[in-house]
């Protein structure tokens, strides 16, 4: 059961807090055999330089090893529990296969404890089941989609997201993403049936800056508030407008200026996002 709670304004930090509570989530510790140490990088690379700004601090986390390949074919797995995962917006499910192996998978919406899932070439079209796009009926809602066969799911993994299979053309399937983009994917790539869980994730409101800090996100300082040595907009006597068109700390135009290179997979886009 999902509960959306708005905190009472007992303090400025509680006034705007909106929390989403799922009473069906496991409250204990994660399964020890599928947990790895996650070292805090604080936005630094291997030479110690900051390569991603505004990262650092936050609560210590452990990484849950999630199975995105779903390559254990034709063996039924029973859902033992649904868990919270601090590393992603979706919930995860701990499943126990008939041969005794346990794995974490991204939990789809509607998957509950004691339900069964299975993956394979020809399995039932049911929530949580994984199969090649070749064998999925048109119009089916899917998630956790591979971009290359046997590489593991790379698309549609965030909370509440889904795509729809709208066509099949020679060796390719055509899927429609939430953004309106139409994309071709090889028919041999696998996908999972259903919508990703925790669709209420976007209703959360952290309420205060400290909640961002708990998540390892540091403040974003405006360029005009800095000194000239730190930013092209810095300096000046009193408040200034920056004196030029908006740029990044490295002098590259921002606010609409395109810097992204085309990906090789862009050639598979049939229709651009709206």
Swiss-Prot record:
Read off the InterPro entries from this record. Answer: NA-bd_OB-fold (IPR012340), Rib_uL2_dom2 (IPR014722), Ribosomal_uL2 (IPR002171), Ribosomal_uL2_bac/org-type (IPR005880), Ribosomal_uL2_C (IPR022669), Ribosomal_uL2_CS (IPR022671), Ribosomal_uL2_dom3 (IPR014726), Ribosomal_uL2_RNA-bd_dom (IPR022666)
Recorded GO molecular functions are: rRNA binding; structural constituent of ribosome; transferase activity
UniProt lists compositionally biased (Basic residues) regions at 257-274
Instruction: Tell me which SUPFAM superfamilies the record gives.
Output: Nucleic acid-binding proteins, Translation proteins SH3-like domain
Query: Does this UniProt record's set of keywords contain rRNA-binding?
Result: yes
Disordered: annotated segments: 224-274
Q: Name one Pfam family in it.
A: Ribosomal_L2
**Quick one: a GO biological-process term for this protein?**
cytoplasmic translation
Q: Which cellular component terms (GO) are annotated to the entry?
A: large ribosomal subunit
Keyword list, A-Z: Ribonucleoprotein, Ribosomal protein, RNA-binding, rRNA-binding
Please explain the role this protein plays, according to its UniProt record: One of the primary rRNA binding proteins. Required for association of the 30S and 50S subunits to form the 70S ribosome, for tRNA binding and peptide bond formation. It has been suggested to have peptidyltransferase activity; this is somewhat controversial. Makes several contacts with the 16S rRNA in the 70S ribosome.
Q: What's the subunit arrangement here?
A: Part of the 50S ribosomal subunit. Forms a bridge to the 30S subunit in the 70S ribosome.
Q: Which NCBIfam families match?
A: rplB_bact (TIGR01171)
Family listed: Belongs to the universal ribosomal protein uL2 family.
Entry protein name? Large ribosomal subunit protein uL2
């Amino acid at each position: 059961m999902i509960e959306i709670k708005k905190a009472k304004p007992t303090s400025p930090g509680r006034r705007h807090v909106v929390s989403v509570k799922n009473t069906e989530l496991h409250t204990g510790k994660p399964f020890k055999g599928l947990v790895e140490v996650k070292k805090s990088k604080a936005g630094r690379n291997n030479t110690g330089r900051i390569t991603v700004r505004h990262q650092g601090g936050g609560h210590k986390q452990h990484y849950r090893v999630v199975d995105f390949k779903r390559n254990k074919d034709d063996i039924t797995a029973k859902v033992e529990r649904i868990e919270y995962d601090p590393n992603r917006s979706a919930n995860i499910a701990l499943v126990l296969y008939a041969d005794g192996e346990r794995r974490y998978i991204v939990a789809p919406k509607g998957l509950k404890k004691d339900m069964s899932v299975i993956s394979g070439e020809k399995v039932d079209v049911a929530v949580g089941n994984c199969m090649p796009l070749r064998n999925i009926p048109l119009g089916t809602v899917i998630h956790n989609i591979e971009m290359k066969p046997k590489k593991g799911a790379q698309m549609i993994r965030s909370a509440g997201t889904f795509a729809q299979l709208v066509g099949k053309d020679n060796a390719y399937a055509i899927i429609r993403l939430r953004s309106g983009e139409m994309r071709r994917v090889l028919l041999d790539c696998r996908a999972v049936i259903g919508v990703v869980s925790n669709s209420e994730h976007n209703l959360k409101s952290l309420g205060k800056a400290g909640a961002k800090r708990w998540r390892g996100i540091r403040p974003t300082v405006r360029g005009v508030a800095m000194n000239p040595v730190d930013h092209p907009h810095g300096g000046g006597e009193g408040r200034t407008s920056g004196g030029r068109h908006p740029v990044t700390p490295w002098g590259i135009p921002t606010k609409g200026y395109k810097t992204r290179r085309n990906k090789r997979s862009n050639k598979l886009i049939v229709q651009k996002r709206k």
